Each structure stands twice: as structure tokens, then as C-alpha cells.
């Protein structure tokens, strides 16, 4: 019988340069918490004619499952990853970000008396203004990223993620967290072991997309 991993890490990829995806993948494979699997969901990328991503996944097939489908956006891609993962806990990583080596073990230690956590990040920006994003409830107001619930910092039990779906709306991460609060025990924690590259050249945000809000009709 196949071993059930403790943690499933879900990563949706759409036209992210391979060197950035590789950095993200390697940050998962180099965790000090080894009992994990990585589910790569290729959201119909068109920039990988040489199949670098698939080939790299095959090199680490004991840890990585590769799924490809037609482009439908981050939320639906992560939802599909949830359906195809096996872990008792589920984590998310954006394809242009990375974990510090202790990130997942940090998250596991925070799960006492919680079913779902959202953590702060170490945020890397080009400009000071990039630390601020439009408020979900009032787009004329800006809030610091430390005060946001970021899609990729969510970490929780399998039950939370299989009970709820990410919606194709702006601030899908905050909406998910709010819906989870109605049924589960939640915590916002200060870890700083998730490296969040915001509006850096080559990142999702730099490619005219707002992280966590890709729409799919």
C-alpha cells in the first residue's frame, strides 16, 4: 500500500519562467520536513516547448506529481490539486515564490488548536509602495501585505481544503479564510518563512496579474 504523506504542497504554474519554478520546487524538496509530496498543476502553460517542467518533475517522481490541463486560472488549478493530493495537511506555494527550509515544520508546529493557519511572509519588493495592496472591502484604501491573508501562506488540515473550494474572485484567499472561519479553528501566525516576491520582474504580479485573484469563467 502506498504511503500517505503528512503534507501535500500544491503549486499552480502558468507561464512562470522555469528558473523561478525550479527555485520554488527546490525549496520544497529541501525542506527539513521530509514527509511530503508536491503536486504541480500546469495550468496550460505555453512557454515550455522543451518540457523542462515535466522533465524536472520526472527526475523527482518519488516526491512530485505533475498534472496538466487547459488554462483555467489559479483557483481552479488549486482545487484540482486538492482532489489529487494525499496528505493529511495541505500547503500552497506560488510558482515564483519559495519556502525557507524550515517553513513546513514551522507550520506543523502552529497547528495545535487550529485547523487552518495563514502566516505572514518575508516580502521582497522593488518599490516601497509594493508592500501595499487594495483593501478587499474598499479599493480606494491600501493595506500592508502583513495585514492580508495571502493565498499561498494557507496551511491546514485536509478536511478544511476538501470541504471548501477556492472561488474565482478577487481576494479568493481572504474569502476562503472567512468561509473556513464559520466551520473551523483558524489562526494568523507570524512565521516569515515564506518568501513572497511581489512585483519582481518575472513574477506573477509583474506579468500583469494580481496574485491570488486570477479569474476563470
PLM feature segments, named:
Residues 1-27:
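N-proximal low-complexity "stem/linker" segments adjacent to membrane-targeting elements
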Residues 42-51, 94:
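A conserved acidic beta->alpha catalytic loop
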Residues 48, 97-110:
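Acidic donor-binding/catalytic loop of UDP-sugar-dependent glycosyltransferases
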Residues 104-131:
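Conserved donor NDP-sugar-binding/catalytic core segment of glycosyltransferases
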Residues 25-35:
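Short, acidic, metal-binding catalytic loop of nucleotide-sugar glycosyltransferases
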Residues 69-85:
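Glycine-rich, basic loop-to-helix element that forms the pyrophosphate-binding segment
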Residues 90:
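Short aromatic/hydrophobic "clamp" motif used to bind/position activated sugar donors
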Residues 137-216:
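Conserved nucleotide-sugar donor-binding catalytic segment
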Amino acid at each position: 500500500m502506498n504511503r500517505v504523506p503528512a503534507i501535500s504542497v500544491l503549486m499552480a504554474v502558468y507561464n512562470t519562467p522555469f528558473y523561478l519554478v525550479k527555485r520554488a520546487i527546490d525549496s520544497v524538496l529541501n525542506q527539513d520536513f521530509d514527509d511530503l509530496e508536491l503536486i504541480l498543476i500546469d495550468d496550460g502553460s505555453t512557454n515550455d516547448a522543451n518540457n523542462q517542467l515535466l522533465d524536472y518533475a520526472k527526475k523527482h517522481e518519488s516526491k512530485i506529481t505533475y498534472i496538466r490541463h487547459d488554462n483555467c486560472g489559479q483557483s481552479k488549478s488549486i482545487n484540482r490539486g486538492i482532489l489529487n493530493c494525499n496528505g493529511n495537511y495541505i500547503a500552497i506555494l506560488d510558482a515564483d515564490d519559495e519556502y525557507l527550509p524550515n517553513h513546513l515544520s514551522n507550520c506543523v508546529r502552529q497547528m495545535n488548536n487550529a485547523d487552518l493557519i495563514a502566516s505572514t511572509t518575508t516580502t521582497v519588493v522593488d518599490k516601497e509602495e509594493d508592500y501595499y495592496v487594495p483593501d478587499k472591502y474598499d479599493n480606494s484604501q491600501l493595506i500592508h501585505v502583513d495585514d492580508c491573508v495571502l493565498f499561498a501562506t494557507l496551511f491546514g488540515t485536509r478536511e478544511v481544503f476538501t470541504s471548501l473550494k477556492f472561488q474565482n474572485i478577487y481576494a479568493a484567499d481572504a474569502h476562503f479564510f472567512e468561509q473556513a472561519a464559520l466551520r473551523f479553528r483558524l489562526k494568523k501566525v507570524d512565521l516569515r518563512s515564506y518568501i513572497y516576491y511581489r512585483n519582481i520582474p518575472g513574477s506573477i504580479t509583474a506579468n500583469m496579474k494580481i496574485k491570488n485573484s486570477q479569474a476563470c469563467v
